Amino acid sequence: MKPAIFLMLFVAMFLISEGEGFKPKDAPQERSVFSPVVQSCPRCHRRDHFGKCRKLDPCPD
């Protein structure tokens, strides 16, 4: 086989293994620290420094 075929196979395998970067833009987004759109937490929850919603105890009304 020609070396170019091996190179193309390697690139194709790399792209498949790195599939996280090739999601369509309209796909539901995973939680991202760098995401400019921050969804609000439910009532009695606050966002911690990891970006996750945590339930407050006790709940302030």
Swiss-Prot record:
Localization: Secreted; Nematocyst
Signal peptide limits: 1-21
Protein keywords: Disulfide bond, Hydroxylation, Nematocyst, Secreted, Signal, Toxin
UniProt main location, coarse: secreted
Disulfide bonds: C41-C53, C44-C59
Modified residues (Hydroxyproline): P36
Propeptide stretch(es), residue numbers: 22-31
Organism superkingdom: Eukaryota
Family note: Belongs to the Hau1a/HC18/HC19 family.
Function as written in the Swiss-Prot or TrEMBL entry: Toxin that is lethal to crab. Does not produce the typical symptoms associated with sodium channel toxins in crabs, suggesting that it likely does not act on sodium channels.
Misc remark: A synonymy between H.magnifica and R.crispa is controversial.
Name assigned to this protein: U-stichotoxin-Hcr1a
Species lineage: Eukaryota, Metazoa, Cnidaria, Anthozoa, Hexacorallia
